[in-house]
Swiss-Prot record:
Subunit architecture: Interacts with FtsZ.
Similarity field: Belongs to the ZapD family.
SUPFAM superfamilies assigned: YacF-like (SSF160950)
Keywords (A to Z) from UniProt: Cell cycle, Cell division, Cytoplasm, Septation
Compartments where found: Cytoplasm
Protein name in the entry: Cell division protein ZapD
One BP annotation, GO: FtsZ-dependent cytokinesis
The species this protein was found in: Pectobacterium atrosepticum (strain SCRI 1043 / ATCC BAA-672) (Erwinia carotovora subsp. atroseptica)
Annotated disulfide bonds: none
The keyword Nuclease is assigned to this record: no
Encoding gene (name): zapD
Length: 250
């Protein structure tokens, strides 16, 4: 997020696996942004992100889906080998990275298991569902731990984040390749509505000028999608008859 940018980027997943991956990416970013745990607020944000990440990981076989996607991306890169003028050194480098990530992910323990077995995480996770349930009288262990020397806390936090490294590295690579597979092109909505074919895409990326004070409401799946633009101010906002925006189908 940046106030300096004149455009806003929106992303919408077109299948369940991409939806899960974007949620994991978002939670991973929250963990790394709040890992310093300088106060109770940042600590609760950090532990809440861990709890939500574990919930997401427990809903499906994330590792299997990532391994399938790493293999699929390798095959896609292999197809580029037949294109005249393609940078073969770059292709080989990316394929090696994908193979290494696949091997590391396959050898890693169960996703999130190290975090599930941690006593402090378990206690905090149990109390997060209770409104205000992480007060010092509810969780004296957390209150005491936050007053431990910074070096000791950082050492433990590093071990938590490091346990997620195989997951994060594989996911970062996959999402980067998916995002770069689509090119932004100018599109125009009529009376706030736009629809098109998705062509088995995984992800929609939409750039919109901030000055319009609009946001997109997107629905769709791997074959077709629809976008409706709505005003931030639902009472006094205006939707132009023709609105230009940029869209990438990835």
């Amino acid at each position: 997020m940046s106030d300096a940018s004149s455009t806003i980027l929106f992303e919408y997943p077109l299948n369940e696996k991409t939806r899960t991956w974007l949620r994991i990416e978002s939670l991973s970013q929250q963990l790394h942004q709040n890992h310093s745990l300088t106060d109770m607020g940042s600590a609760l944000t950090f532990f809440r992100a861990i709890a939500e990440l574990l919930d997401v990981l427990e809903r499906g076989d994330v590792r299997t889906e990532l391994l399938k996607e790493l293999e699929r991306q390798q095959q896609k890169l292999l197809q580029w080998s037949d294109v005249p003028g393609v940078d073969m050194e770059r292709i080989h480098s990316l394929r090696r990275q994908l193979k290494d990530l696949s091997s590391t992910l396959m050898a890693a323990p169960r996703m999130g298991q190290f975090l599930r077995e941690d006593r402090l995480i378990g206690m905090v996770r149990q109390r997060l569902g209770i409104p205000g349930g992480c007060c010092s009288f509810d969780l004296p262990t957390l209150h005491s731990w936050l007053h431990q020397p910074k070096e000791l806390r950082e050492q433990l936090v590093f071990s938590w984040l490091n346990s997620l490294s195989p997951l994060k590295q594989a996911l970062d690579m996959i999402l980067e390749l998916i995002r770069h597979s689509g090119t932004f092109r100018p599109q125009t909505s009529l009376n706030g509505f736009f629809q098109d074919n998705a062509s088995d895409a995984d992800l929609l990326r939409l750039r919109l000028e901030q000055m319009h004070q609009l946001y997109p409401q997107i629905s769709g799946h791997k074959t077709r999608y629809a976008i409706r633009f709505l005003p931030l101010d639902s009472e006094n906002g205006h939707i132009p008859p023709r609105l230009t925006f940029e869209l990438a189908c990835c």
